[in-house]
Amino acid sequence: MFSSYSLCKCLVSFHILAIQVLISCASSLNLTNEYLNHKCRKYQPGSEYEKELNTLSRRVATLDFTDGFTHRSNSRDTKSVTIIFQCRGDSYRSKCNSCYATALAGFRSRCPRNKGGIIWYDQCFLDVSMINDNSPRRMNYDNIFSMHNPNNVRGNVNSFNKKTTEFLYKLIGKADRLDVDGINFLYYAAGEMRLGKQTLFAMVQCAKDILSCKDCLEWSIKELSKCCDGKQGARVVGTICNLRYELYPFLRT
């Protein structure tokens, strides 16, 4: 059985009007790592930049991804290379390493000889750039897009939208708080909620180096109202934060 997903909106620098991603549902738990989207920039083959990129990408591959995130740079002035990589909150350690390998291979395939680019998968994203800045990142509206399930909700659409939005805001409150040690922000929350005879599954997540997780996620919820009212599933995806809801389980528990 297949369900299709549509890339319904791209902001600023995306010139893709629509895309459909087929997600194979092999079991009741729909765990996939489908390619979602990408964007690229060019560089010269055999350049010093390419050598630095190869060096840094190999270094990142050796990480254990305990928290599923890294922001690393090779500082060489104009030859600087920065990699930002994050896994979905339920994918870490070996699963995160596997997603990094997939994302890196996908980046090299879709962005050959590119001086930076971003590629998104279900379970991770990879951002390669020349920006040598490890300071906390602000909201970036250039690299955000939304996707939705083409199927509409049956019944009271307004009630579904309202309850879904309220649940997402509840998850934001859980994600935008400190961990049990009171040191780091969690920046991830997931849960489920009964909606009559159906169950709503949802998650919210921010990058570990963002200045304001709450602001990014609240902005993303507003985007849902523009693209995805009454849809059985939807997501807003970026490199700063992302959120998703479905009427089927899609996360590891």
UniProtKB/Swiss-Prot annotation:
<dbReference type="InterPro" id="IPR050581">
    <property type="entry name" value="CRR_secretory_protein"/>
</dbReference>
<feature type="domain" description="Gnk2-homologous 1">
    <location>
        <begin position="34"/>
        <end position="133"/>
    </location>
</feature>
<keyword id="KW-0964">Secreted</keyword>
<keyword id="KW-0732">Signal</keyword>
<feature type="signal peptide">
    <location>
        <begin position="1"/>
        <end position="28"/>
    </location>
</feature>
<comment type="similarity">
    <text>Belongs to the cysteine-rich repeat secretory protein family.</text>
</comment>
<dbReference type="InterPro" id="IPR038408">
    <property type="entry name" value="GNK2_sf"/>
</dbReference>
<feature type="domain" description="Gnk2-homologous 2">
    <location>
        <begin position="141"/>
        <end position="250"/>
    </location>
</feature>
<dbReference type="Pfam" id="PF01657">
    <property type="entry name" value="Stress-antifung"/>
</dbReference>
<dbReference type="InterPro" id="IPR002902">
    <property type="entry name" value="GNK2"/>
</dbReference>
<dbReference type="GO" id="GO:0005576">
    <property type="term" value="C:extracellular region"/>
</dbReference>
<protein>
    <recommendedName>
        <fullName>Putative cysteine-rich repeat secretory protein 33</fullName>
    </recommendedName>
</protein>
<keyword id="KW-0677">Repeat</keyword>
